[in-house]
């Protein structure tokens, strides 16, 4: 067996000495992968022919399903396995075997509640004899408060879209996941079309000063298409994605305004234009990615200016009295953000809205999206498994955009539980999903898991409690998490992270202090080592690992508790802890 790590096993001397980062072989689409795409190519060819007549090439589904889909009553996990296995067979590739039970348990805890399991939780799962124990664990974790906290972290990062200055929407997201709000409702609320007390409209409010970024982020996050390249010229890869689309998406927010911290829609607006690449001046018309436009009343420029100025004066007067009476300007007859939501969720367009989120969740849980890159979902960028993407999107829509149901289904497949180890020199193409991806932990996952490994009683005390205690745990984890990089595709752990961790005396001092004290009370060395490895790595140590750790402790001249803490520090700084494998 060959591991993706630079040694034969996670618990090697390299791991103990604090080596960080896998040396994973990377490969593009192999010949075997591309050879099984004939129906996909035909679909793209048909889309190209249609585009020549309609001019809507880029919005055509990304290699949409060429074959009839499986029946809707099939389970999500079974459908994932069917389509992935079908392509593996066509490519002549046998998948990796199932991961061991301890690895599956750790993977589920990290993906569903954002932390490693405690030693007792991991042991309990491995020891359980029920044939449906994995399904039971998924139900338990998805029904816990940790599920809401973890998804609040994950979606907060998604909505920030890589902008470190983006406002945190975590309080809103936490409430939304606790109440199990569907994704379409959350979309409306984030556009300022609901009455959520946690102010999700901050997503728009804090971007009003940069409407270019607002148009980009809305298109990318919710519809899987980054339209930035069309801001100044025709998109280089999508022939029909012109400047009209960029400014058309931007126009949906042209009347939005920050009024004393409230997102309002103005009634009046000045006619807007932009200078096209060919030098002509063109009017800005609200236009969705489908090419559908919103008709605006024709007005004389002078009359529009007069109406705009008069409304501005009324808004200014209301602002002066807002502190006293909290009176908002009257709602506009035409709310362009409302029209954007209606267009996006219409029967004709909702599949794009659904596919974008499905693809992002698949990427999060499997290490790769069905379409890569995640914000380049268009007809010229084929999905690796178009029928699977189509089925999952249809299922997501048919079940009311239920996020928890989709996540639970995705982690129920056999493919999700595959081993991350491969027994040949080169692993198969990533797009085949033949072997589990090794995924770096997010800052939040690493920070909370670090606390669990250092003092497992924190979870015992707080895992079932609500907001205040869990929030304290998350807040403490964030201070640790800043020492590591947030994951991105093809991340390679660099020397900077190793240096930060090597020069964090307060972290080193706190890591495992309480656990080391607990271990020191155990009667013999083998029990200490066994408990340490179960706590940090969520599994039993191998005989070689146990011998290595015993030798390490025997060589220490420091007090027993301090020696144990040094051992724990090495375990926490190993690749096995840093990655979800």
Predicted regions and their residues:
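Short, structured secondary-structure elements
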Residues: 66-282, 352-393, 403, 407-519, ...
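Bacterial N-terminal signal peptides
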Residues: 45-62
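Long, low-complexity, polar/charged, intrinsically disordered or flexibly structured peripheral segments
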Residues: 295-330, 342-343
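Residue-identity detector for glycine
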Residues: 11, 18-21, 25-29, 55
